[in-house]
UniProtKB/Swiss-Prot annotation:
Binding site for phosphoenolpyruvate: 24-25
Gene: murA
Organism listed in the record: Vibrio atlanticus (strain LGP32) (Vibrio splendidus (strain Mel32))
Name used for this protein in its record: UDP-N-acetylglucosamine 1-carboxyvinyltransferase
E.C. number: 2.5.1.7
Binding site for UDP-N-acetyl-alpha-D-glucosamine: 93, 122-126, 162-165, 307, 329
Amino acid sequence: MMEKFRVIGSDKPLSGEVTISGAKNAALPILFASILAEEPVEVSNVPHLRDIDTTMELLKRLGAKVSRNGSVHVDGREINEFCAPYDLVKTMRASIWALGPLVARFGEGQVSLPGGCAIGARPVDLHIHGLEQLGATIVLEDGYVKASVDGRLKGAHIVMDKVSVGATITIMCAATLAEGTTVLDNSAREPEIVDTADFLNKLGAKISGAGTDTITIEGVERLGGGQHSVVADRIETGTFLVAAAVSGGKVVCRNTNAHLLEAALAKLEEAGAKVETGEGWISLDMTDRELKAVKIVTAPHPGFPTDMQAQFTLLNMMAKGSGVITETIFENRFMHIPELQRMGAKAEIEGNTAICGETEKLSGAQVMATDLRASASLVIAGCIAQGETIVDRIYHIDRGYDKIEDKLSALGANITRFSESN
C-alpha cells in the first residue's frame, strides 16, 4: 500500500501555532552514540519518525535494551552483536554512525553499506578515512564496512578533506574513547553536532570546540549514563515559517530557537516577512505584506542550509521579482522543480542554479515526492494551489517530518493521508 497526501488548496492564509519536534539530525547520532555508554541513557524530545524507529530496532539487534515512553531509554550494557545488517541499513544512511561507537567501545564493528534519499553522490569514505587515522583497520567486503582495532583507538590530529557533518560525528564519537587527544580540523559546525557533543559530555566525554571548525576530544576510558533533551529541528521550524510566508499567514513556532536558523530568518525578513523571536519561540507575520524574491546560495552551517533550499525555491516562485538559488552542497537537488512546474510554477534550471519568480498561481496536480525536504515544498505548494493536489511517495516526508499533516491542519490546511494499493 502506497500512502499519499490529498491537499485541497485555498487562498486562506496558514495561521496559528505549531510545536516543533526534536531534530532528527541530532536524535539519530545521539542514539547511535549511546552505544558508547556503559550505563543506561535517557533521551527526550525525540521525534516520532521512521528513521528513529529503525535506529531503535538496530540498537536492539546489537543487544541493547531499548524502550520508548515519552523519552527513549537505551541500556547498552549487554550489547553483544557488532554488526548492523543490510535489512535495516538499506532504508537509512545514518546507520554508518554505528561503526565508530562499536569499534571504539568493543574493538570491532561492521555496517552494511547504506541507502537513503537519492541526492547525488554521498560516499562513506570520509567516515572510513577518519577511523583509519584513529588506528582502526577497515576492510570492505560483501557489501559491509568492517572496522577493527587491537586495544583502544589512538588520538590523532585529523584534517577533514572536506566539511562533512556525518564524518565529523563519526570521528568525534569514536575519539571519545580513544587513548590520548584528537584534534579534528575543518570539522562541520552544525547545531546537531554541538548537541551530540553536549550529550557525550554529559556521559563523561571531554569534547570542546563543537560548533567551531576545530573540535578537540580528550579520550576517556569509559562513558557512564545520563539524560539529554534533543535540540529543536531547525529545518522543520523553517518549513513552517515558509508555509506562513507563502500563504500570507501568521505562525508562531514553539519549542524552537532563533539561533539555530539565523541565515534562513535573515532571508525571510529580506523576503518581506515580519519575524520576531523570543525564548523558545519564533513568529512570522506576512499579513498584508508583499513577498519579494531573494538570492540564496546554500553553504555549510552557519551559511544557508541546503535542507531549506526547496522551501525557498517555492517562496521565490510565488514572490515578486526574480530570485536565483545556487545549490553548492548536493548535486541533483532540484528534483522538486519539475514537480512544481507541473503545478504551473515558473523556473529555469541552469546547472546548479535555479531562477524562479512571478508565478501568478499554482494549480493542483499529481506530484511525486523525490527526497525528504523537496517533498515538504510540494505539500506547502498544494496548500496554496487552486484545486486538489495528490502528493505521492510520502514515505520520504515521513522520514523527516513528525506528523506534518496534523501540524498543517492545525494551521488551517486541508490535508489528509490516504493509501491506495498500487
